[in-house]
């Protein structure tokens, strides 16, 4: 099997697994308990929180542990909406968002909130002039993904944050799920930010919501203080510690890992450009970890299934998106519905080898000949 779907899930790093197992065996107490075992568990989770805070440049009190980015996005957007409901009910986002953002905004819209979506430029970035046009005194939030999961485009967070300084009632939420471990991530100028460990070689089931200390969101789970007043319950100490380990590895090894991925991406682009029926949808300014393409007149779902039959794992859209619909992200940059329906995504890792790329290209050639010939026969 050749795995080229690292944007959907990454394998846990062996050091992360070792950390989890070690802490799980050693810390048997409830971190909320006032005895030796509880104190030891509390010390472990406090150490993890301090490490995470240092790596992300935030204060420990700004860290909320969650089950993952979907929970973090829901928590942030619903919390900001409720917090600011007396100041306004207008929210701005983009058509590129993960379903945990777009779905939450749809739910808020049904509660009377007004949602506007930003125009997307042909390079995949948001139209900042359109943002300025949409902003109003009653705009309470702008929400966008830092790195698009389908195209790999990086949004200009610093410029967006600068624009919002003139709107004191407006908060900025950033979904950094696909960014951590791929590009440097800063919380500067941001009010809330979501991320999840399983995207940077950590374990499933643990994520973070970063929240400015001065924001008093309604608790996600009521019942008393745990690691924070915002999410009651017994903290999973080993998961928190494993996230800190994964984050440390991701930050420390970012330059080396990115260089490896850039090399694999260049090999792919050079080979795929030789196919006249292939259209590369990811712009040149996209991160190298994500390469989105379309094969003319062959639906992305069809090509993905054929590759899977040959032992190659790729994705059509985000793993959490609905099947059968064209990619919103690809349509936004190409304005071509057929092209969007034909699109699929290769996502790379520092673990991806040159041999895997060469084998993928061999399989791709076989699938491309079969599927384009089948279309031509109709």
Report residues per predicted region:
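Pyridoxal 5′-phosphate
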Residues: 1-378
């Amino acid at each position: 099997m050749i795995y080229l779907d690292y944007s959907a899930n990454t394998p846990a790093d062996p050091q992360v697994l070792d950390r989890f197992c070690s802490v799980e065996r050693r810390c048997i107490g409830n971190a909320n308990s006032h005895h030796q075992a509880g104190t030891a568990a509390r010390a472990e989770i406090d150490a993890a929180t301090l490490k995470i805070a240092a790596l992300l440049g935030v204060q420990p009190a700004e860290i909320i542990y969650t089950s993952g980015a979907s929970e973090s996005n829901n928590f942030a957007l619903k919390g900001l909406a409720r917090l600011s409901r007396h100041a306004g009910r207008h929210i701005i986002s983009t058509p590129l968002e993960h379903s945990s953002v777009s779905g939450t905004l749809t739910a808020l819209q049904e509660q009377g909130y007004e949602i506007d979506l930003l125009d997307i430029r042909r390079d995949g970035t948001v139209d900042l002039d359109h943002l300025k046009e949409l902003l109003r005194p009653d705009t309470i939030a702008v929400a966008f993904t830092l790195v698009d999961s389908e195209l790999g485009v990086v949004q200009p967070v610093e410029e967006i944050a600068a624009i919002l300084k003139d709107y004191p009632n407006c908060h900025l939420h950033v979904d950094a799920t696909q960014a951590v471990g791929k590009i440097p991530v800063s919380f500067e100028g941001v009010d809330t930010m979501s991320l999840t460990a399983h995207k940077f070689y950590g374990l499933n089931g643990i994520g973070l919501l970063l929240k400015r200390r001065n924001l008093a969101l309604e608790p996600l789970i009521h019942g008393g203080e745990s690691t924070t007043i915002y999410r009651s319950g017994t903290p999973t100490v080993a998961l928190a510690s494993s996230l800190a380990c994964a984050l440390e590895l991701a930050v420390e090894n970012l330059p080396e890992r990115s260089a490896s991925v850039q090399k694999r991406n260049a090999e792919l682009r050079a080979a795929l450009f030789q196919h006249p029926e292939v259209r590369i949808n990811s712009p040149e300014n996209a991160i190298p970890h994500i390469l989105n393409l379309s094969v003319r007149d062959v639906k992305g779902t069809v090509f993905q299934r054929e590759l899977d039959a040959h032992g190659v794992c790729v994705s059509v859209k985000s793993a959490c998106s609905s099947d059968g619909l064209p990619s919103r992200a690809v349509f936004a940059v190409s304005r071509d519905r057929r092209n969007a329906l034909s699109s699929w995504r290769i996502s790379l890792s520092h673990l991806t080898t040159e041999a895997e790329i060469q084998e993928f290209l061999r399989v791709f050639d076989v699938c491309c000949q079969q599927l384009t010939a089948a279309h031509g026969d109709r």
